[in-house]
Amino acid sequence: DLWNLLPENNVLSPVLSPPMDDLLLSSEDVENWFDKGPDEALQMSAAPAPKAPTPAASTLAAPTPAISWPLSSSVPSQNTYPGVYGFRLGFIHSGTAKSVTCTYSPSLNKLFCQLAKTCPVQLWVDSTPPPGTRVRAMAIYKKSQHMTEVVRRCPHHERCSDSDGLAPPQHLIRVEGNLRAEYLDDRNTFRHSVVVPYEPPEVGSESTTIHYNYMCNSSCMGGMNRRPILTIITLEDSSGNLLGRNSFEVRVCACPGRDRRTEEENFRKRGEPCPEPPPGSTKRALPTGTNSSPQPKKKPLDGEYFTLKIRGRA
């Protein structure tokens, strides 16, 4: 009766499972063990180690080095060239108040402006250029040791979500309120520029105004890094031939009025010759210096006596 209570598949079986049977040595294996040396016997009994699959990470390329922007192969000219059409620039009169967002110094030929604020630039011509004429704006570094570097925004401002849908994030100069603006990257020089069609002045006006924005501070690390820049404005025909050129220095800062006053005072103290202001500018140049020196105050002389006469007294 107890035998019948056991399960049909006996737990104890004289037949070993196939995996265990493979681990046991047969009589032939034992004979070969003694016939061969111990080193060969160990090689026979040891199962070959399975080859580990090659990890996918090993096929990845080495990390790329930090990006270094290429140097430009050429430096645009910054010399003033009115051309046959008398091309020149002008700026709206603005003072040095603390609240001003954009101000131009004729004595320095320098524009001081805040980040991303409107900077009106007037275009003056003596005669109307041909149809298809374009106006190009490009920034370059002023000092000779930096001229071959391309002016671009700092990495922080490149990542800012302030795009107007037209300008690439690395471009410093933008045109405000003009959907026909084209932002170009030169394949040969790697320089950035923005081009707009030239529009003749409206009725009753003598100049055309383009509103520019500067999208990075002059002090930004990784960008201009306190290096002075120039903005070159060129007048070109439809084929890209030069019709006129003018330029001015730009400083993008938090307080344009204060910085303009400071630089003009330093300029007068140095006594440097005053550059000619643009013919279209409505702001007069500041005097470069004066020969008169402040008169010292006269000190009262001790030991003098004065007589005071009073009328109406007995």
Curated annotation (Swiss-Prot):
- UniProt-recorded Gene Ontology molecular function terms: DNA-binding transcription factor activity, RNA polymerase II-specific; metal ion binding; molecular condensate scaffold activity; promoter-specific chromatin binding; RNA polymerase II cis-regulatory region sequence-specific DNA binding
Keywords on this record? Acetylation, Activator, Apoptosis, Biological rhythms, Cell cycle, Cytoplasm, Cytoskeleton, DNA-binding, Endoplasmic reticulum, Isopeptide bond, Metal-binding, Methylation, Mitochondrion, Necrosis, Nucleus, Phosphoprotein, Repressor, Transcription, Transcription regulation, Tumor suppressor, Ubl conjugation, Zinc
Q: Where in the cell is it found?
A: Cytoplasm; Nucleus; Nucleus, PML body; Endoplasmic reticulum
Record region (Transcription activation (acidic)): 1-24
Q: At the top level of its lineage, which domain of life is listed?
A: Eukaryota
Oxidoreductase in keyword set: no
Phosphoserine occurs at which residues?
A: S13, S17, S26, S161, S247, S293
Region Interaction with DNA: start and end of each range? 251-258
Q: Needs which cofactor?
A: Zn(2+)
Q: For the modification Symmetric dimethylarginine, which residues carry it?
A: R313
Q: Where is this region: Interaction with E4F1?
A: 234-272
Q: Where does Zn(2+) bind?
A: C154, H157, C216, C220
List, alphabetically, the GO terms of the cellular component aspect: centrosome; cytoplasm; endoplasmic reticulum; mitochondrial matrix; mitochondrion; nucleus; PML body
Q: Which residues bind DNA?
A: 80-270
Post-translational modification N6-acetyllysine, affected residues:
K98, K283, K299
- Site feature location: Interaction with DNA: K98
Residue ranges annotated as motif Bipartite nuclear localization signal = 283-299
What disease does the Swiss-Prot or TrEMBL record associate with this chain?
p53 is found in increased amounts in a wide variety of transformed cells. p53 is frequently mutated or inactivated in many types of cancer.
Domain note: The N-terminal and C-terminal disordered regions undergo liquid-liquid phase separation (LLPS) following homotetramerization and activation. Post-translational modifications, such as phosphorylation or lactylation affect the ability to undergo LLPS.
Task: Report the function annotation for this chain.
Answer: Multifunctional transcription factor that induces cell cycle arrest, DNA repair or apoptosis upon binding to its target DNA sequence. Acts as a tumor suppressor in many tumor types; induces growth arrest or apoptosis depending on the physiological circumstances and cell type. Negatively regulates cell division by controlling expression of a set of genes required for this process. One of the activated genes is an inhibitor of cyclin-dependent kinases. Apoptosis induction seems to be mediated either by stimulation of BAX and FAS antigen expression, or by repression of Bcl-2 expression.
Stated name of the protein: Cellular tumor antigen p53
